[in-house]
């Protein structure tokens, strides 16, 4: 978020090349320059996690289970897409080769085009679907 704010909110695929491609030097410089804002976001995440754990413990103590779902697709303009472009079907300029949607059905005569980039399952398989394992493990631990 800090870099996105610094870039006036534009999508990461339109950032300067050194940031878009996550060049180590540029990312380290951004971390240094934006350290205060980064710490603010870390603090927000800490506060949310602390409050979530208290709420969940209270609900569980009262016999209430809290469940949620995990979105299957990531947004084009997401930290997941920026940090892991190799797991998605992008061209050399990070434009999606294909996007998610669904065909016409009872809810939409024209179908739906969601715009989420599709996964590159061959690339994900190379490390045993590590991104998915990490994502599901985090969600499981967060809910349990």
What are these regions (language model features)?
Residues 1-53, 73-144:
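Alpha-amylase-like alpha-glycosidases and glucanotransferases acting on alpha-linked glucans and related
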Residues 66-68:
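Hydrophobic faces of well-ordered beta-strands that scaffold small-molecule active sites
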Residues 60:
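Anion (oxyanion) recognition and catalysis
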